[in-house]
Amino acid sequence: MPLIGDDAPSFTAVTTQGIIKFPDDYKGKWVILFSHPADFTPVCTTEFMTFASMQEEFRSMNTELIGLSIDSVFSHIAWLKRIEEKIEYKGMKNLEIKFPVIEDLKMDVAKKYGMVQPKASTTQAVRAVFIIDPEAKIRTILYYPQSTGRNMQEIKRIVVALQKNAAEKVATPANWQPGEDVIIPPPSSMEAVKERMGKEEEGKRCLDWFMCLKKDTQK
């Protein structure tokens, strides 16, 4: 089972958008790879509709979505068509799901990513989310039980925070939202501590020598 910081396992898979090769087809992009237990299930349907409503928003963030379950591509297609043509939820309807959904009947990809967890199910993937950076490194792993749908806004928030860390080398505090203050890395020497505490900078505030924040300039 891969962990945060590991290389994301490579794979070639049949999907609703044709064959994909990961990571080759996604070089230079952030990827949200997520699994769901089964097609034609209510919680998964709400998740796919919500992801579909946000797919262009994610794409504008240089982030691509890839879905997966242990179902056939024909089941995926039938389910996605039903979602597009028949289902309305929270004002969302007629949603075209443009991102690929992997057929993983032999559980090849699911097992590589630890998406099959026997105490939950031996025949279905759990609700897993892997956020993968442009260098194909795993940056976040999330697991949800079958009964609980994912919070897509939280997934988006994590992507924004990871991208900010990659670009600016800052951290984000608890409950952070884009536009709020970010955390400057703490100094790593006594000299750096003296320099930081003795120097005032516009937009920066220190609660203590190890805890300084600055305004988020890219909102």
Curated annotation (Swiss-Prot):
Residues that hold substrate according to the record: 127
GO biological process: cell redox homeostasis; cellular response to stress; hydrogen peroxide catabolic process; response to oxidative stress
Keyword Oxidoreductase among record annotations: yes
GO function term, MF aspect, one: thioredoxin peroxidase activity
Domain of life, source organism: Archaea
Catalytic residues identified in the record: 44 (cysteine sulfenic acid (-soh) intermediate)
Residues in Thioredoxin domain copies: 2-164
Disulfide feature: 206-212
Pfam families: 1-cysPrx_C, AhpC-TSA
Stored InterPro entries: AhpC/TSA, Peroxiredoxin, Peroxiredoxin_AhpC-typ, Peroxiredoxin_C, Peroxiredoxin_TDXH, PRX_1cys, Thioredoxin-like_sf, Thioredoxin_domain
NCBIfam families: PRK13189.1
Protein family: Belongs to the peroxiredoxin family. Prx6 subfamily.
Subunit structure: Homodecamer. Pentamer of dimers that assemble into a ring structure.
Its biological purpose: Thiol-specific peroxidase that catalyzes the reduction of hydrogen peroxide and organic hydroperoxides to water and alcohols, respectively. Plays a role in cell protection against oxidative stress by detoxifying peroxides.
Other comments on record: The active site is a conserved redox-active cysteine residue, the peroxidatic cysteine (C(P)), which makes the nucleophilic attack on the peroxide substrate. The peroxide oxidizes the C(P)-SH to cysteine sulfenic acid (C(P)-SOH), which then reacts with another cysteine residue, the resolving cysteine (C(R)), to form a disulfide bridge. The disulfide is subsequently reduced by an appropriate electron donor to complete the catalytic cycle.
Protein's recorded name: Peroxiredoxin
Organism whose genome encodes this protein: Methanosarcina mazei (strain ATCC BAA-159 / DSM 3647 / Goe1 / Go1 / JCM 11833 / OCM 88)
